[in-house]
Regions:
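Transmembrane beta-strands of outer-membrane beta-barrel pores
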Residues: 44-50, 70, 80-84, 117, ...
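Cleavable N-terminal export/targeting peptides
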Residues: 1-35
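Outer-membrane pore/translocation modules
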Residues: 87-89, 93-199
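Residues that define the transmembrane beta-barrel architecture of outer-membrane proteins
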Residues: 36, 58-62, 105-109, 124, ...
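Repeated loop/turn-to-beta-strand initiation elements of outer-membrane beta-barrel proteins
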Residues: 72-78, 121-126, 177-183, 214-220, ...
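Structural signature of outer-membrane beta-barrel channels/translocons
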Residues: 67-73, 114-120, 173-177, 209-213, ...
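Outer-membrane beta-barrel "beta-signal"
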Residues: 260, 291-307
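Detector for outer-membrane/organellar transmembrane beta-barrel domains
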Residues: 161-246, 251, 306
Length: 307
């Protein structure tokens, strides 16, 4: 009887300890914070480069956005950046041709929605969506260099061109050990950033990132090709090809750089970008207000905080 009683007590003790362990484990799991479906980010960069073309005339930019991702895979988001290329197009020369619309604002506002899910396996998320680039302005005066506008003031288009753009996109993410990245295809269903007759432009690109496993450093590489149909006839084209002329606005771009994870949602990046954007005569297809190459090689540094 004593032996049986001892065994019963031991069994009870084991059950009690097991129960306490389970409760402790449950409490630990319950204490783990839930992953929020809402994230935010803010970036300070030495320049805003998009598809190899400067959007801030090689000057600093501040950027930020919000994202909501549902567990089903659907998501929506907004991203914004300071820019100068719209106001630069008006300020290229002196009055009277520089007068920008009073409702213009030095900002780009992007709105997007889509569906992202690992449809073909872990680490291989497929992504489909629509992206609206919105620029608060009553009209774009053309992306013309100061030299050309000075020589052809009567041909300058000072309003009426809408730079806002709508794109559809499809992307396939991949993971191969320490290498991650994605291939993406973007298609413009509207004119592309104010370029006339450019609906149907598309941009295939490939991005790859290699986690070195040292000091939180990742190597980043990117290549893309901006195709613009019809050699786009624009007021800008007149600059290098004569009245009624055309030029080739298509080009390739690339980027190579490093990203450093500092922890706590803080990261820094440094990279170099370049393009094959063409020159027509003495005029660049994508020109800065003073006639420089907006697609020239650029070194950029940035600091990003995610929340």
């Amino acid at each position: 009887m004593k032996a049986l009683q001892k065994t019963a007590i031991s069994a009870a003790a084991v059950a009690l300890l097991t129960g306490l362990t389970s409760v402790a484990a449950f409490a630990e799991e319950a204490a783990a914070p839930e992953v929020s479906p809402v994230t935010a980010n803010v970036t300070v960069a030495s320049s805003y480069i998009y598809r190899g073309i400067t959007q801030s005339n090689n000057k600093p930019a501040i950027q930020g956005g919000f994202d909501y991702a549902h567990e089903s895979g659907f998501y929506v988001g907004n991203w914004n950046s300071s820019i100068s290329w719209i106001s630069d197009s008006y300020n290229a020369v002196s009055t009277p041709v520089k007068s920008a619309p009073s409702t213009s604002a030095p900002i780009e506002m992007d709105f997007y929605a889509g569906f992202k899910k690992e449809l073909i396996g872990e680490g291989f998320a497929s992504d489909f969506g629509v992206l609206q680039y919105y620029y608060p302005t009553t009209g774009l005066g053309g992306i013309q260099s100061k030299a050309w506008v000075t020589a052809n003031p009567s041909l300058r288009q000072t309003s009426g061109v809408n730079p806002s753009t709508t794109e559809l996109y499809a992307a396939q993410n991949f993971t191969f050990g320490a290498v991650t990245g994605f291939g993406k295809f973007s298609y413009a269903v509207s004119n592309l950033f104010g370029l006339q007759n450019s609906a149907g432009s598309f941009y295939p690109d490939l991005t790859a990132n290699y986690d070195t496993g040292m000091y939180g450093i990742t190597v980043n590489a990117h290549v893309g090709y901006q195709y613009v149909p019809n050699n786009v006839v624009t007021t800008v084209a007149l600059a290098g090809a004569g009245n009624g002329g055309t030029w080739n606005a298509s080009y390739a771009d690339w980027k190579l750089g490093l990203t450093k994870d500092f922890g706590g949602g803080l990261s820094g990046s440094a990279y170099y970008t370049g393009t094959s954007a063409q020159k027509v005569g003495s005029t660049y297809v994508y020109a800065t207000p003073n006639g420089g190459n907006a697609g020239r090689g650029n070194a950029v540094v940035a600091l990003t905080k995610t929340f």
